[in-house]
Amino acid sequence: MTKVGIITGSPHFNGASQKLADSFEWGLKENYTNIYRYDAGLQGEGEPHFLQLENAPGMEVGIPNHDLVERKVIPKLLEADVIVLVSSLYYFEINAQFKAVIDRFYDYNHELKDKKMVFMMVGYGTQEDMDAVKLHIRKLNQYMRWQMLGEIYADDSWNEEKLANFAKKAYELGKSIK
């Protein structure tokens, strides 16, 4: 059975990116897939922690935080066959809560390599407004040596009809993962 780890980042409860992630997850459940989801943007005060490195010349070693990301999220991602990243667009980039979790991959680059990936983003702007993110995700995907299974860039997410169409695409993408 395929194991899937979903990471979302929006701090908006029931926001547009949550709707996309929910639809994707419903599609996954059609195939009884083993799913773990972490909503980084909806965590309490102090979660998630940012990457911290030891202060040693020539050494770039992360300082373990023993927080939720370290104890639960990273182990679930290490077990996962597919990693799904879902963000909202903030100032032409992924949001900070989401980025904080991605930065924590640093100590696990080798263990996380060669997985499959899905990326989804929503934004109130245009496709062009998401160009920087598209480059960022392409570079992350190459660096991690992940196989891209699909991408959805949901522009004009304020438009409920358009968002519903993107949510349907997310559902179908989730359903396609076996």
Residue ranges of model-derived segments:
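Surface-exposed acidic, glycine-flexible loop patches that form ligand/cofactor-binding
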Residues: 109-111
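Generic, ordered loop/turn and secondary-structure boundary motif
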Residues: 92-95, 113, 153
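Histidine-bearing beta->alpha loop at or near hydrolase active sites
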Residues: 156-158
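Glycine-rich nucleotide phosphate-binding loop and flanking beta-alpha elements
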Residues: 90-91, 126
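Short beta-strand elements in bilobed, periplasmic/extracellular small-molecule ligand-binding domains
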Residues: 32-39, 146-154
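Short, glycine-/small-residue-rich phosphate/pyrophosphate-handling segment
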Residues: 113-151
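N-terminal beta1-alpha1-beta2 submodule of the flavodoxin-like/Rossmannoid cofactor-binding fold
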Residues: 1-86, 92-107, 160, 164, ...
